[in-house]
């Protein structure tokens, strides 16, 4: 009887030790997967950022800014509009102001990294965001949801 109790005790202890070891291994593996996922995501979106930076040097990009300004002018329909651009895009200020009209003001924005424009109607406080930064952020969220890189419990 004593032998049986000892055997049961040792069996339970070994099972507990094994369960603990398995849990530690699963936790370590989950962390490694999370780190790999983050690294892969960073590489993908760093490459996308480089591609966007090259795009902003093209005529297509300046045409896109003009198109955005036209959409904003139409959406804000004669409002008191302030456009926000990154420093590198301030060279387009006069062209964009001419499109939006009505005393449109252009302001440099430090939080626009990749390009595009953001607008605000200074009277109604309505906002429009057509920045490449926001589009990239939305794509990153989509990528994380649909890439199959989710980590299941």
Give the location of each predicted region.
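Elongated, mostly alpha-helical coiled-coil "stalk/stator" tethers of large membrane protein machines
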Residues: 32-153
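Long, amphipathic coiled-coil
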Residues: 1-40, 44, 48-55
């Amino acid at each position: 009887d004593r032998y049986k109790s000892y055997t049961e005790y040792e069996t339970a202890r070994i099972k507990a030790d094994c369960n603990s070891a398995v849990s530690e291994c699963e936790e370590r593996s989950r962390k490694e997967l999370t780190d790999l996922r983050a690294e892969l995501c960073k590489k993908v979106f760093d490459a996308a950022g480089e591609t966007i930076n090259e795009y902003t040097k093209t005529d297509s990009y300046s045409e896109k800014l003009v198109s955005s300004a036209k959409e904003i002018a139409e959406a804000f329909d004669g409002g008191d509009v302030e456009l926000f651009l990154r420093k590198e895009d301030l060279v387009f200020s006069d062209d964009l102001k001419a499109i939006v009209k009505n005393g449109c003001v252009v302001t440099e924005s430090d939080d626009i990294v990749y390009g595009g424009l953001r607008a605000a109607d200074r009277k109604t406080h309505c906002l429009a965001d057509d920045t490449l930064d926001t589009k990239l952020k939305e794509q990153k969220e989509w990528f994380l949801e649909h890439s199959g890189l989710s980590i299941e419990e």
